Design a protein with these regions (language model features):
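N-terminal short leaders/motifs
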Residues: 1-18, 130-131, 135-140, 201
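Active-site-adjacent helix-turn-beta-strand microarchitecture at beta-sheet edges
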Residues: 5-105, 211-221, 234, 238-241, ...
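Extracytoplasmic/periplasmic, Sec-exported soluble proteins
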Residues: 7, 26, 51, 83, ...
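Feature captures C-terminal
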Residues: 38-42, 67-72, 124, 128-282
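Glycine-rich phosphate/diphosphate-binding loops and the adjacent beta-loop-alpha structural elements
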Residues: 103-123
């Protein structure tokens, strides 16, 4: 399962097929999958995720011409029987101690665990909480004047748990470290202007087969935003535009709306390309 490319498809195949034939090796990532094979005469590798695999790539290069004359790779599983490196162990402990005062600072409280588990419609309680928080931070005039916020599900990396952490803050208290575990990225919030038609396009781009989207990625939404969709409908036509409402009022396809997303999405991340066209960014 770690070498080979059984069932490989999607963006990585399309990307490799567009490369110049002069490219010999593609060391890829971001998919979190493990693969190692030749695609379009190029050696393509990926080492899964979170340090579970190390890829050993072996190239033979003709010194006279600079050309690669042979190439091979092997994905090696990282096992737990390797002794810890004393230098790295000490370095990690040092920076954990430096970060502890910030990581252990209590920033809020909850009365129960809030999970990222999605329902049949693709929404999660934690995703909606994050979208609500993003909306709350940007809806005032001067701070964005947003009417809706969207959050990508892939950016939610853990549940927000009620039980206290080893830091000893106590049950129900949320620390900065716990919130960082939920969203461990350096993203900022971006509020932009979209038309109603662009919001409809954004919702269509959640679904596999619309534009460059190769998987369903249901955006988490702030309170007051509603719409209907059918998975059985054709690609790019799954959302009923007449059903898209903000606080019960249907959107106008030619009207303009202030929309908040994180900077990853604002740059077209996860193939939500219409967000690149947003104007009046703040």
């Amino acid at each position: 399962p770690y070498n080979g490319c059984v069932g490989i498809s999607g963006a990585i195949v399309d990307i490799v097929n567009r490369f110049d034939p002069e490219v010999d090796v593609v060391v890829s990532g971001h998919t979190h999958n493990a693969y190692n094979c030749v695609i379009n005469n190029m050696l393509v590798t990926s080492a899964a995720s979170f340090g579970r695999i190390v890829t050993d790539v072996d190239l033979t290069i003709d010194r006279a011409t600079g050309e690669v004359v042979s190439m091979s790779a092997n994905n090696n599983i990282v096992t737990r029987d390797v002794p810890q490196d004393s230098f790295m162990t000490a370095l990690i402990a040092k920076y954990n101690a430096i970060a502890a005062p910030l990581a252990n600072r209590v920033i809020g409280s909850i009365t129960a665990t809030i999970t990222r588990t999605t329902n049949a419609a693709g929404e999660s309680a934690l995703g909606d909480v994050i979208a609500d928080a993003q909306f709350d931070a940007t809806n005032d005039p001067g701070f964005g004047d947003a009417v809706v916020a969207f959050m990508n599900p892939g950016g939610i990396r853990a549940d927000l748990t009620y039980a206290g952490s080893p830091a000893g803050e106590g049950d129900g208290n949320v620390t900065y470290g716990e919130s960082f575990t939920v969203q461990p990225f350096g993203n900022s919030l971006v509020t932009m202007t979209l038309t109603g038609a662009q919001i409809d396009t954004l919702l269509e781009q959640q679904f596999n087969g619309c534009g460059t989207q190769n998987a369903n990625r249901i955006l988490q939404v702030s309170a007051g935003f509603t719409y209907s969709w059918s998975l059985a409908a054709p690609a790019c036509n799954k959302v009923d535009i007449a059903s898209i409402m903000i606080n019960g009022v249907p959107i106008n396809p030619v009207g303009t709306y202030r929309v908040t997303v994180n900077s990853f999405l604002a740059d077209g991340g996860d193939n939500f390309l219409v967000l690149r066209d947003g104007t009046n960014r703040l």
